[in-house]
Amino acid sequence: MRTLWRLIASFFKWTWRILNFIRKLALNAIFLVLVLVCIGIWSQFSSTTSEHAARGALLLDITGVVVDKPSASSKLGVIGRQLFGASSDRLQENSLFDIVQTIRQAKDDRNITGIVLDLKNFVGGDQPSMQYIGKALREFRDSGKPVYAVGSSYSQGQYYLASFANKIWLSPQGEVDLHGFATNGLYYKSLLDKLKVSTHVFRVGTYKSAVEPFIRDDMSPAAREADSRWIGELWQNYLNTIAANRQITAQQLFPGAQGIIDGLRKVGGDTAKYALDNKLVDELATSTEVEKALTKQFGWSKADNNYRAISYYDYNVKTLSDQGSAIAVIFANGAIMDGEETPGNVGGDTTAAQIRDARLDPKIKAIVLRVNSPGGSVTASEIIREELAAAKAAGKPVVVSMGGMAASGGYWISTPADYIVANPSTLTGSIGIFGVINTVENTLGSIGVHTDGVATSPLADVSSTKALPPEVQQLMQLSIENGYQRFITLVANARKSTPEKIDQIAQGHVWTGEDAKANGLVDSLGDFDDAVAKAAELAKLKTWHLNYYQEEPTFFSMMLDSLTGSVRASLPAAIQAWLPAPVAAAAETVKAESDKLAAFNDPQNRYAFCLTCANIR
């Protein structure tokens, strides 16, 4: 018996020792990683000089997507990449303004003698963002320094940036994949019918198509007509820019589906030769041949065993002066939600607080609101608008810079501005409001579950498990109609028009920036630089600096966001890994749609949101 007890005691003793060893090992490993990260952060950010020892190229090796305002986890991903060459399945976000600032600094850096665009890991960005980067690349070229693009193949987004280069190399086995733009969404009516879900839709606006997925299985003719117009304009703008850069015609660049098929047939299906023959690229070359050419241009680095170049992620950008008068830059990037900001979304309370801080700061002389949003909560949009109006009333000029989209609620928050600058390819307008309430009384009834009770008023008897009372439906529709009238009145007052005239161009209609200028919804066409210059002009500033209002996350908050985000990202990825490719693709689409719906948290269930704007690809 004693032997048995000794064996049991020995088992628990060794088990504890093993667990304790693992615990200590894990804690020490975490501590070591934290020390290395802190050292790396200090070494990366303590230096403010942009000079590096050897002359060479700036390697613009952008990984992931370009956005106005990257999330905290993306910033941590950049640090991890710099320190350990770490990679992640999560899509890395890169700041548009950091990229442009880097290119402009490199233009004046005597040690940077050119730029190499290596875009194999670049996913893309909205068209106005790409144009802004292209503008910086053109300025770099105009300074007398060359820009080269290298790639085994080019997607549409990659090729757009590559077109700004002096020379484009393409692999002999590669292609330039031009196919056009599309906007697609899921429609749920048949599914909801099969599930016996009762859908109650409240909306104002002929073209307010955000509710169509709940009540149709396809696009309405009005939505198809409107979307065909603006997506065609975006595609034409895309072609015109590249054609001008390549000094060819838009027809030569993209002769249509049949034209491409006929052209490929002439060269036996050789996509690389087709690209060369049609002047889409300048030369077909293997990676070895490209390396030789770049080595001849920039020299050889023994340390890197490659041509001399410094990665965009390793290039130290000088800290700009923060002395004197400032122009505040506040971001409204993503769907507008009620409450605090979450990654990828605009928090009504968070953004309003930033505007208030800028209003009360005596050093801030003007505000530029950078809007890149399809809209969202009406309540949150109004909270932001009111605070922006207060800043304007306090005597601080307010200028709105519209990015890829400033539609619906994104336009609502723009109305107090003294001046609105949009890109020709901005998607804006979509002036309309909707609400959707789904109830599942029939679904539950089909399996024998019913809801019953008493209430002092039909207005109190609201539940997703019961039929929506007619009185509540009437109140909802009245609320939506009131919200729409308020929306067009705000626009009319801001644009010095009348509600009747605004109603003619509203009704949920999406406009490109070019059309919005013609309709009087924006003041001028331009980019972020133009908006800043206008703000300085209105504030009568001769010198100024920009103060970007974005909360810098702590290291631990970045770690937490990264870990939770990785879990959120890895679960769907793990599930999709077991699915056939077509099913996995559909699952990813469903997830993207559900993420959009998750941002709908308006307390009054009223939304000014442009669904099609967020679906373009």
Where are these regions (language model features)?
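N-terminal Lys/Arg-rich, disordered targeting/topogenic segments
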Residues: M1-I22
